[in-house]
């Protein structure tokens, strides 16, 4: 049995210490969670009433998609949001500014720090909506859970203490280190059909597998919900994905989204909700649907959602939420226009049809999640591109693929190989998604199968997927190497800090099979392996179970969440000498006039993700300390002029790191901007990618296009995101050019009405005028004028 370290609740002295429990304690009944589940029912009567009001505003004959129903039923004022600037409600998608009231908020430990620091400055006694904190991002994967978890707890004690004390004070449920990955825990405990929630992580849409509208946001957006302020979203367009047929053989739900990512690309879903429908939906498990929704983030989608389906009822029942299942089933049976399915005749802005019966496994990568290749073509692709043919490691798990179904299908392959006397030729790592999953896999001997085969079972946490991987296989920085993972993201350097590690994304089944071959060119559907006795061995297609026949094991009671009851007597302390946490100083408001004398700090070439702008991995420890983490700003960005990474030049031609030059200019009172290409800020929801440039003196980012979450985060922190009216103008502006704005101040003052230009002065003295576009709403103009959304909230609170 894999023994899990358990979080010891903070004592009066506020000390946090790990301890091990006996097997008897490990499987104790989880009374707290079972009782708490009764309070996790979505406010269905209110949501249904709100939808009825929406029908009155838009007309009862208006056919709505599922996503529209759930979103519009959570509007603060349906008439205001749906009829303002929309041709009396005829042109809502892409035009209306929806002001929404989410049902709940979830935060992971890395992003929760800044979200809580912002929330604390508002001076409220508790959160306005139910909220939870999940400690999953700051746990390193190296040798296994028993070793890694205590070391990570000790190394992050100050941060975990801060998060737990803040949770206790403000009535937030606190899931301690080792309890599981945020999205798996949300699926098991909080997600429900028809729910709308925000999460401070880009893969929050995972909850769409249970019919929820769940949207990834930055911490400042989460604060809106926590203080009961309406949260604003540009009304998304709807991309319908019709599923037909049934998966078979080696194909899995992961292959649906890997295939879709190849069709849409990393920005093809921007501004859309992906809404799955069709007869194929009823053939998928709840956790399989969650996998599809999880990776909607990789195509830029606002979120993804599935309609209520037969698999949701047994999943809710198995996770102690039979009362939610019953209520949702009653709504689903209430008529053809019910909350939990699209209306007949609902129209989609785009429609893609996928035949599950003909879908085969896909492999996506390297370096981008949309480079999709069918498994049957992958070996040739490897050879044509001269990618490494030796597989260094196979890693399964993560929030995308750590369900009971995922793990038992992988176990089936392990058992087949073990019976033939085979062992993995590549390092093999397994990450359970939650304590409930881990305990169940332990009880059912699945973890024993992995361990006996030579696999390493990591803690119930993000680990290598978020860059918390301490590799011990001797791969040097800068050395080309290949890994296969069942993760969701594969940007350069993301997993191990080595930008030459090629991470190929696949299903857990394909990753497991390739780990046994040790080769990136192996195709388990057709190829064979040699057994120790010299015989040919071929894998059979994997089999698994959606849900455990004996029910889920309860797991360790010490890894259940604290009760969400506020306690004003709890003191939340942030030491002024801390290297990990720092209280926030308000940003200065926008000047009374145009911005002038800005300088171009950097012109970015190619892909610029949030990992590029604010790296994770070892930098996660500074997430609560803005001055310290700002030292990693844009360190992954490629210089458009020289091709160098993290190399910037000042006016005199002197060489600096990007954050060093930004800090020097800040000290000299020089404000700056960044010039970038398409989909700037793709990837995670981390608001540090907006906070850090703002802290260092950044005022504007001008790009060919933006990723949705990052564009919003910039506005929230007072940074102005602008796009080139003509993308060719990217080539006309260079590092160290001087820039003045024309029309920006007037646009901000008028609530977003007006046109903006950049007046560029080249080093030669030549002057250029570059027209730019914006997406600023009236409220967002208020954020920027005030200096940040938090400044505006504080100002309103004191009025």
From Swiss-Prot:
<keyword id="KW-0479">Metal-binding</keyword>
<feature type="binding site">
    <location>
        <position position="108"/>
    </location>
    <ligand>
        <name>substrate</name>
    </ligand>
</feature>
<keyword id="KW-0411">Iron-sulfur</keyword>
<dbReference type="GO" id="GO:0006099">
    <property type="term" value="P:tricarboxylic acid cycle"/>
</dbReference>
<dbReference type="GO" id="GO:0051539">
    <property type="term" value="F:4 iron, 4 sulfur cluster binding"/>
</dbReference>
<feature type="binding site">
    <location>
        <begin position="685"/>
        <end position="686"/>
    </location>
    <ligand>
        <name>substrate</name>
    </ligand>
</feature>
<feature type="transit peptide" description="Mitochondrion">
    <location>
        <begin position="1"/>
        <end position="32"/>
    </location>
</feature>
<dbReference type="GO" id="GO:0003994">
    <property type="term" value="F:aconitate hydratase activity"/>
</dbReference>
<keyword id="KW-0004">4Fe-4S</keyword>
<feature type="binding site">
    <location>
        <position position="489"/>
    </location>
    <ligand>
        <name>substrate</name>
    </ligand>
</feature>
<comment type="function">
    <text>Has no detectable activity towards cis-acontiate or cis-homoaconitate.</text>
</comment>
<protein>
    <recommendedName>
        <fullName>Putative aconitate hydratase, mitochondrial</fullName>
        <ecNumber>4.2.1.-</ecNumber>
    </recommendedName>
</protein>
<dbReference type="GO" id="GO:0005829">
    <property type="term" value="C:cytosol"/>
</dbReference>
<feature type="binding site">
    <location>
        <position position="462"/>
    </location>
    <ligand>
        <name>[4Fe-4S] cluster</name>
    </ligand>
</feature>
<feature type="binding site">
    <location>
        <begin position="201"/>
        <end position="203"/>
    </location>
    <ligand>
        <name>substrate</name>
    </ligand>
</feature>
<dbReference type="GO" id="GO:0005739">
    <property type="term" value="C:mitochondrion"/>
</dbReference>
<dbReference type="InterPro" id="IPR015932">
    <property type="entry name" value="Aconitase_dom2"/>
</dbReference>
<keyword id="KW-0408">Iron</keyword>
<dbReference type="InterPro" id="IPR001030">
    <property type="entry name" value="Acoase/IPM_deHydtase_lsu_aba"/>
</dbReference>
<dbReference type="GO" id="GO:0046872">
    <property type="term" value="F:metal ion binding"/>
</dbReference>
<dbReference type="Pfam" id="PF00330">
    <property type="entry name" value="Aconitase"/>
</dbReference>
<dbReference type="InterPro" id="IPR006248">
    <property type="entry name" value="Aconitase_mito-like"/>
</dbReference>
<feature type="binding site">
    <location>
        <position position="399"/>
    </location>
    <ligand>
        <name>[4Fe-4S] cluster</name>
    </ligand>
</feature>
<dbReference type="InterPro" id="IPR018136">
    <property type="entry name" value="Aconitase_4Fe-4S_BS"/>
</dbReference>
<dbReference type="InterPro" id="IPR000573">
    <property type="entry name" value="AconitaseA/IPMdHydase_ssu_swvl"/>
</dbReference>
<keyword id="KW-0496">Mitochondrion</keyword>
<keyword id="KW-0456">Lyase</keyword>
<feature type="binding site">
    <location>
        <position position="465"/>
    </location>
    <ligand>
        <name>[4Fe-4S] cluster</name>
    </ligand>
</feature>
<keyword id="KW-0809">Transit peptide</keyword>
<feature type="binding site">
    <location>
        <position position="494"/>
    </location>
    <ligand>
        <name>substrate</name>
    </ligand>
</feature>
<dbReference type="InterPro" id="IPR015928">
    <property type="entry name" value="Aconitase/3IPM_dehydase_swvl"/>
</dbReference>
<dbReference type="InterPro" id="IPR015931">
    <property type="entry name" value="Acnase/IPM_dHydase_lsu_aba_1/3"/>
</dbReference>
<comment type="similarity">
    <text>Belongs to the aconitase/IPM isomerase family.</text>
</comment>
<dbReference type="Pfam" id="PF00694">
    <property type="entry name" value="Aconitase_C"/>
</dbReference>
<feature type="region of interest" description="Disordered">
    <location>
        <begin position="538"/>
        <end position="564"/>
    </location>
</feature>
<dbReference type="InterPro" id="IPR036008">
    <property type="entry name" value="Aconitase_4Fe-4S_dom"/>
</dbReference>
<dbReference type="InterPro" id="IPR050926">
    <property type="entry name" value="Aconitase/IPM_isomerase"/>
</dbReference>
């Amino acid at each position: 049995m894999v023994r899990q370290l358990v979080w010891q609740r903070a004592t009066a002295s506020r000390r946090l210490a790990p301890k091990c429990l006996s097997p008897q304690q490990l499987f104790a009944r989880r009374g707290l969670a079972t009782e708490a589940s009764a309070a996790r029912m979505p406010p269905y009567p209110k949501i249904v009433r709100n939808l009825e009001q929406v029908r009155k505003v838009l007309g009862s004959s208006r056919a709505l998609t599922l996503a529209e129903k759930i979103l519009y039923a959570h509007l603060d004022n349906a008439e205001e949001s749906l009829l303002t600037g929309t041709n009396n409600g005829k042109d809502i998608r892409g035009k209306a500014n929806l002001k929404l009231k989410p049902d709940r908020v979830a935060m992971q430990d890395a992003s929760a720090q800044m979200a809580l620091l912002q929330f604390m400055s508002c001076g409220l006694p508790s959160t306005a909506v139910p909220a939870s904190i999940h400690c999953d991002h700051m746990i390193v994967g190296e040798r296994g859970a028993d070793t890694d978890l205590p070391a990570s707890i000790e190394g992050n004690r100050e941060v975990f203490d801060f998060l737990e004390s803040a949770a206790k004070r403000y009535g937030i449920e606190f899931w301690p280190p080792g309890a599981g990955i945020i999205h798996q825990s949300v699926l098991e405990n909080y997600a429900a059909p028809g729910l709308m929630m925000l999460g401070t992580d880009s893969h929050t849409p995972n909850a769409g597998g249970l019919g929820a509208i769940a949207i990834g946001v930055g911490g400042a957006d989460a604060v809106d919900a926590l203080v009961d302020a309406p949260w604003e979203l540009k009304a998304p367009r709807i991309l319908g994905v019709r599923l037909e047929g049934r998966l078979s053989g080696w194909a899995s739900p992961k292959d649906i989204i890997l295939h879709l990512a190849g069709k849409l690309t990393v920005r093809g879903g921007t501004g859309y909700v992906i809404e799955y429908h069709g007869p194929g939906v009823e053939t998928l498990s709840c956790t399989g649907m969650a996998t599809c929704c999880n990776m909607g983030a990789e195509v830029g989608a606002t979120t993804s959602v599935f309609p209520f389906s037969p698999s949701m009822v047994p999943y809710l029942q198995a996770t102690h939420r039979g009362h939610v299942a019953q209520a949702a089933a009653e709504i689903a049976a209430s008529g053809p226009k019910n909350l939990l399915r699209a209306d007949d005749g609902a129209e989609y802005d785009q429609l893609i049809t996928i035949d599950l019966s003909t879908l085969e496994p896909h492999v996506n990568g390297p370096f981008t999640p949309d480079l999709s290749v069918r498994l049957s073509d992958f070996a040739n692709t490897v050879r044509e591109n001269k990618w490494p043919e030796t597989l260094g490691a196979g890693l399964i798990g993560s929030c995308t693929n750590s369900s009971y179904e995922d793990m038992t299908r992988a176990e089936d392959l392990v058992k087949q190989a073990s019976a033939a006397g085979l062992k993995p030729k590549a390092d093999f790592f397994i990450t359970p998604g939650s304590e409930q999953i881990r305990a169940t896999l332990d009880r059912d001997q699945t973890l024993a199968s992995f361990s006996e085969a030579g696999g390493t079972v990591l803690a119930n946490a993000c680990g290598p997927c978020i860059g918390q991987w301490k590799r011990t296989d001797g791969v040097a920085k800068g050395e080309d190497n290949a890994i296969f993972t069942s993760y969701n993201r594969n940007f350069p350097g993301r997993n191990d800090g080595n930008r030459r590690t090629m991470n190929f994304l696949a299903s857990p089944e394909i990753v497991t099979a390739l780990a046994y071959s040790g080769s990136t060119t192996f195709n388990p559907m057709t190829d064979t392996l040699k057994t120790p006795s010299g015989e040919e061995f071929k894998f059979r297609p994997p089999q698994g179970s959606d849900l455990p026949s004996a029910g889920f094991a309860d797991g360790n009671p010490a890894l259940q969440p604290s009760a969400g009851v506020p306690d004003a007597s709890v003191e939340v302390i942030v030491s002024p000498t801390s290297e990990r946490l720092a209280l926030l100083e308000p940003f200065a408001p926008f000047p009374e006039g145009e911005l002038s004398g800005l300088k171009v700090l950097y012109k970015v070439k190619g892909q610029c993700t949030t990992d590029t702008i604010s790296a994770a991995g070892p930098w996660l420890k500074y997430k609560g300390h803005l001055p310290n983490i700002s030292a990693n700003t844009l360190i992954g960005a490629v210089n458009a002029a020289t091709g160098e990474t993290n190399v910037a030049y000042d006016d005199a031609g002197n060489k600096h790191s990007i954050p060093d030059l930004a800090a020097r200019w800040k000290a000299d009172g020089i404000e700056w901007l960044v010039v970038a290409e398409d989909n700037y800020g793709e990837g995670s929801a981390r608001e540090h990618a907006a906070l850090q440039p703002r802290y260092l003196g950044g005022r504007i980012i001008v790009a060919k296009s933006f990723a949705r979450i990052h564009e919003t985060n910039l506005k929230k922190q007072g940074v102005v995101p602008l796009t080139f009216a003509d993308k060719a103008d990217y080539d006309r502006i260079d590092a160290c050019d001087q820039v003045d704005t024309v029309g920006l101040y007037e646009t901000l003052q008028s609530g977003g009405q007006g046109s903006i230009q950049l007046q560029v002065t080249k080093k030669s003295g030549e002057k250029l005028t570059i027209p730019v576009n914006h997406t600023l709403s009236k409220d967002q103009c208020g954020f920027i004028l005030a200096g940040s959304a938090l400044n505006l909230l504080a100002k309103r609170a004191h009025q």
